[in-house]
Regions:
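Short alpha-helical "recognition helix" segments of helix-turn-helix
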Residues: 40-46
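Short, Lys/Arg-enriched anionic-surface-contact patches
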Residues: 3-29
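Major-groove recognition helix of helix-turn-helix-like DNA-binding domains
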Residues: 50-64
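Short Lys/Arg-enriched helix C-cap and helix-to-coil transition segments
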Residues: 60-76
Length: 76
C-alpha cells in the first residue's frame, strides 16, 4: 500500500466529527515522505477537494517543528 492510499483509508475510516483531525495527524505522520508533494498533488492523490491543499501545507510546516521538539511520527 502506498502512502496516499494509507492516508486516504485512514481519513475514510475516521469518525465524521474527527475527519479534519485525522487528516492533520496523517500529514504529520508522513510529512517527511510528503516533503516534495504539493498541496494540489496531495489533494488529487487522496481524492480531496483542492481547498484542503492549504491545510496540507500548514501541517507539513507544523510537522517539522514537532519533529524538532522530539515528536516520533511513528507513534501516531
Amino acid at each position: 500500500m502506498n502512502v496516499f492510499s494509507e492516508i486516504k483509508d485512514a481519513i475514510e475510516r475516521a469518525p465524521r466529527n474527527s475527519y479534519v483531525a485525522e487528516l492533520h495527524l496523517q500529514v504529520i505522520k508522513f510529512a517527511e515522505v510528503l516533503e516534495n508533494v504539493s498541496g494540489k498533488e496531495f489533494c488529487e492523490k487522496v481524492d480531496l477537494k483542492s481547498a484542503w491543499g492549504t491545510e496540507f501545507t500548514k501541517m507539513k510546516k507544523i510537522a517539522k517543528r514537532l519533529r524538532a521538539a522530539g515528536l516520533d511520527p511513528k507513534k501516531i
